[in-house]
Swiss-Prot record:
Pfam families (alphabetical): Ribosomal_L11, Ribosomal_L11_N
Protein family (similarity comment): Belongs to the universal ribosomal protein uL11 family.
GO molecular function: large ribosomal subunit rRNA binding; structural constituent of ribosome
Name recorded for this polypeptide: Large ribosomal subunit protein uL11
Naturally occurring in which organism (per UniProt): Gloeobacter violaceus (strain ATCC 29082 / PCC 7421)
PANTHER family reported for this sequence: 60S RIBOSOMAL PROTEIN L12, LARGE RIBOSOMAL SUBUNIT PROTEIN UL11M
Length: 141
């Protein structure tokens, strides 16, 4: 018989640096999850992606056990890293924050493809290009 799900929790945590302090502790503690066990597993599975923010979806069962699924880093994090800027422009229509190449755009789209609502890389590139435009990042051809 399948276990009954008691909660689903979504968090965005720095890779390899999850610790019991907020926001992890309170989010998991209220559902009775072993926080240290989650932190150790998360840090082990994201050790190769240090420096990125990795969203995670945690499914908590009624017996207080849990499973979690790692997602791809947010497009905004990948774009700022590719453009070499700290954050997007406050006024994307007037001020440009940085520039990325078409090849970098394709690489980000391929990386994000599993989490995007797109069937192919071309559609994913359009989605990522829209995010870049809203951040004030120019795509050079």
């Amino acid at each position: 018989m399948a276990k009954k799900v008691s909660a689903k929790i979504k968090l965005a945590l720095p890779a390899g640096k999850a610790n019991p302090a907020p926001p992890v502790g309170p989010a998991l503690g209220q559902h009775g999850v072993n926080i240290m066990m989650f932190c150790k597993e998360y840090n082990a599975r994201t050790a190769d992606q240090v420096g990125m923010v990795i969203p995670v979806e945690i499914t908590v069962f009624e017996d207080r056990s849990f499973t979690f699924v790692l997602k791809t880093p947010p497009a905004s994090v990948l774009l700022t890293k590719a453009a070499g800027v700290e954050k997007g422009s406050g006024k994307p229509n007037k001020e440009k924050a940085g520039t990325i190449t078409g090849a970098q755009l394709r690489q980000i789209a391929e990386q994000k493809l599993p989490d995007l609502n797109a069937n192919d890389v071309e559609a994913a590139m359009k989605i990522i290009a829209g995010t870049a435009r809203n951040m004030g990042i120019v795509i050079a051809d």
